[in-house]
Amino acid sequence: MTSHWLFQLALLAIVVGWLVGAYNRLVRLRNAIVTAWEQIVAALVRRSDAMTAVAAAVREPLAAEAATLQALAEADAKLRTAADGVRQSRGRIADVSLWVTAEAALSSPASRLRALIELQPALLAEPPHGEQLAPALAAWREAEPRIQFARQGFNDAVDRYNRAIHQWPTRLVSMLFRFRPGGRV
């Protein structure tokens, strides 16, 4: 009778130990998503600051394009809001989708502004504007690959997490503690 009771206790300890280990693994993977997202946010802030500097440098010479500059500022603000939503939800699919939509909405005014600057190379040569514009454009160009690299890291973290919550027997823990799939960008 005593050995039967000890066997059950040992089995229970093994199951509880596995549950704790599986739960901690899922939490660690979910936290890796948050960390990877912070890398994207850091790159987005760099790009946003660079775009703001570019817009400020060309605001006067491109006064006729005030609508483009305004659209860029609004799209950037929406992107930052969406990025905060992803951070708070820890990569929930719906919030990631909103961010992807905001990123796509930013591309049009950003591309238009870049095209306007390329069509007017004198902007870079003019002393008051060119001195501010050249470093801001360089920072903007440098930010884009950083964002792509950070997105890849985020997607890798999401893939590892999603695989873990769908694999048997960890699937039981993910259902029990309501771990939800993460979204890719």
Residue ranges of predicted features:
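A helix-centric hydrophobic-segment signal that preferentially recognizes long
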Residues: 2-185
